[in-house]
Structure formats: structure tokens, C-alpha cells
């Protein structure tokens, strides 16, 4: 009986061992994927995710992981070597360039798209257009009632982005501007929200509200109104979107003044699959993704 049991155990082992060995190996034909990490601008998250999806359809051997967190967060990750690509809706700051140099990082800049920053209000707002100066005075707290700019007699609720946001930085520098060489700051009454989507939702619920963000997030929405913006009192008013579509020409030719490039930064010149992905982004196929996502493609050369 003991011999029969021993024989049974032996046969069982002969069956199990090949199965265990097979389970520890990759199936024949499996290829280890190249992983590319992308981090940064919340303005660019949806666009970057779509780029990644379209590229991975063509290159299943590559896995691209996209996260947001803000332009500053993405740049910090690049400088700490925890991401291959930093998305940013602003250029690198001098302090960031110094930090990069001290860490042996050589940031390379890629212009990948353009974006208009829309100023949005509730659809029931009586205000349709503002000058840059009025927008600055509103967000700095000089103007606190809609009546001062042709609206109803009610207080203005300010909604803005967190200070790690490239949109926050750009809007502060180019819209709030400077007085006597000193940077104008946001009103302390500004309600800070994490991400453009959350800001849009807040304004959509608040008839007294005003906010700002990438036009691609708002162009197709009917629960917020995009204001027309004038450079000054004597200038025509332009909107970055009409009939739920982004107006490329107004941004390309500078008529809509609150606009900017969107950037990707890498550590040194991209090589291998990383270069191939960056080439895809600025290719006609990649720029078509920009259009479909309601951002502004690079001007045709």
C-alpha cells in the first residue's frame, strides 16, 4: 500500500511541476512594455490622455501613464526624475531652471498646442463682455459687485485655481498684470478649486460666480457662459469660442489676447520610444487629436 501511495505522489508531482514552471514564465510572444510617465498640467490632462490612447493603439508595446496635479507638480516631478514628461501650461520659471541645473537636469521644451483661457460666468449673468482691466479689477478685488460692470446689483463670487496651476500663474501674470512694476495679486476672497472641471461646476451652480480656465473645457458646455473679452474700452470684444466650437483663428492671430502655448518638458532630448511619442504629438495625427479635444493646434508652417 505504501508503495502505491508513493507512486501516486510521484505521479502527482510529475503533473504539477511542469504546470508550476509554465506559470512562472511569460507566455511565448509576451513582450515587456516600455512605460512612459506623463505628469503635470490639469489643463492638459484630457488632451494628453487622448494622445496616449491614440499612440498606444498604434504601439501596443508602449504603456503611457498620464496624471495631473498642476504644472508646478509636473515640473517638480521632472526635476526629481519621477516622470519622463512634464506637461505645463506655462514656461519654466527661472528658479526651476536653476533647480534643474543644480540637479544635473537639462529640460528640453516642446510646444505641443495652444490654449485660450476663457473667462466664464453663469448663463443667467447679464454681463456678456469685459475689458482686460475689468477682469483684473474683479479678480484682484477692486470690483466686488456685478453692477459696476453692467450686471445685476449683487456681489461677485470669485473662483480660481490653486497656486501650483500653470493657469493660475499665467492668468495672474497676463491678466491681473502689474501696477508700477509690482505684480497684482488675487483677492483673498477667491475660492480656490482643484482643477478646471471643479471650477466649471462651481460657476455653473452660482449665478454670482466668475472663473477662468482652458477654453477646451468649456466650449461645448451650456451650463456656463464664456465672456467676450476686450483689450481696452475702444477695442472690439472677442470670445475664444463661438457656437460651442473653439475659434482657432482668433487665437492664432492674437485677436483673443488671453492665450498661450502648452508645453511638454523632457530631461534632455527625447530618444527611443519617448522621442517617437513626442514626434507623434506634433505630427498631423497628433495635432488632429488637439482639434478633436477642442484645443488649438499649432499654427501651420
Indicate where each model-derived feature is located.
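Bacterial N-terminal signal peptides that target proteins for export
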Residues: 2-11
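N-terminal targeting leaders
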Residues: 15-16
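C-terminal motif of bacterial Sec signal peptides marking the signal peptidase cleavage site
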Residues: 19-23
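Exported/periplasmic ABC-transporter solute-binding proteins
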Residues: 24-301
Amino acid at each position: 500500500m505504501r508503495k502505491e501511495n508513493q507512486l501516486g505522489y510521484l505521479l502527482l508531482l510529475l503533473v504539477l511541476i511542469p504546470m508550476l514552471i509554465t506559470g512562472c514564465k511569460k507566455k511565448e510572444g509576451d513582450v515587456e512594455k516600455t512605460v512612459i510617465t506623463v505628469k503635470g498640467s490639469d489643463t492638459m490632462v484630457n488632451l494628453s490622455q487622448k494622445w496616449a490612447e491614440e499612440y498606444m493603439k498604434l504601439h501596443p508595446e508602449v504603456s503611457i501613464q498620464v496624471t495631473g496635479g498642476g504644472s508646478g507638480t509636473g515640473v517638480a516631478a521632472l526635476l526629481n526624475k519621477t516622470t519622463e514628461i512634464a506637461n505645463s501650461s506655462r514656461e519654466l520659471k527661472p528658479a526651476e531652471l536653476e533647480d534643474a541645473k543644480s540637479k544635473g537636469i537639462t529640460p528640453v521644451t516642446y510646444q505641443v498646442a495652444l490654449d485660450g483661457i476663457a473667462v466664464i460666468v453663469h448663463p443667467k449673468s447679464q454681463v456678456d463682455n469685459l475689458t482686460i482691466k475689468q477682469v483684473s479689477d474683479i479678480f484682484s478685488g477692486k470690483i466686488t459687485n456685478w453692477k459696476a460692470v453692467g450686471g445685476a446689483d449683487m456681489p461677485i463670487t470669485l473662483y480660481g485655481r490653486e497656486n501650483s496651476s500653470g493657469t493660475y500663474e499665467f492668468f495672474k501674470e497676463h491678466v491681473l498684470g502689474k501696477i508700477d512694476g509690482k505684480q497684482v495679486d488675487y483677492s483673498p476672497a477667491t475660492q480656490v478649486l482643484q482643477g478646471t472641471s471643479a471650477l466649471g461646476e462651481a460657476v455653473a451652480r452660482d449665478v454670482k460666480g466668475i472663473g477662468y480656465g482652458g477654453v477646451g473645457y468649456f466650449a461645448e458646455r451650456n451650463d456656463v457662459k464664456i465672456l467676450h473679452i476686450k483689450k481696452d474700452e475702444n477695442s472690439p470684444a472677442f470670445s475664444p469660442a463661438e457656437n460651442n466650437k473653439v475659434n482657432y483663428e482668433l487665437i492664432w492671430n492674437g485677436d483673443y489676447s488671453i492665450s498661450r502655448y502648452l508645453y511638454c518638458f523632457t530631461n534632455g532630448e527625447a530618444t527611443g520610444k519617448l522621442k517617437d511619442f513626442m514626434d507623434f504629438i506634433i505630427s498631423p495625427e497628433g495635432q488632429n487629436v488637439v482639434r478633436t479635444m477642442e484645443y488649438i493646434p499649432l499654427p501651420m508652417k
